[in-house]
Amino acid sequence: GPVETMGFKAFNLARMAAIGLPVPQAFVLGTPFCQTFGDDPAAFRPALRKLLESQIERLEAACGLEFGSGRKPLLVSVRSGAPVSMPGMMDTLLDVGLTDATLRGLLRLTGNPRLVWDSYRRLIQQYAEVVHHNPAAPFREALALAMAATGARRPQELDFHALTRLARRNL
């Protein structure tokens, strides 16, 4: 059934959308697609690129934002999925599309420098850990040092200046 081909989270989001609940715009690269890509990545890469481009264009049109834009950047989440709920076991990348070139645009949209720099810091860490399989310890240590330097007891207490330094350090 559909849950096996799209994963538990995507399936439930689709069900919510079908009954009229507000859910974010999305698309799914289903299990058959991913299995085919996994069989021969080099041969299938052009089809993947074309599919991603068309789906990103659809999201841009629906949201009025543009992926990679310095003025109104579209940010996306990339989530792995499984047919059953597996809390904490599946990888997620949030705020994909946030780069040095899109930071100012997100700041203009949100007016919140702390949000922007914390999101960037988290994306850098997630990308390093999930995509490049870097250990989490250096990121945790850098966060602990930033908190100690500013007297923060929790990461939420770091101001955007500290988060900016932390994000730049982690790049």
Label the predicted regions.
Residues 1-171:
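Nucleotide/phosphate-binding sheet-loop regions of phosphoryl- and nucleotidyl-transfer enzymes
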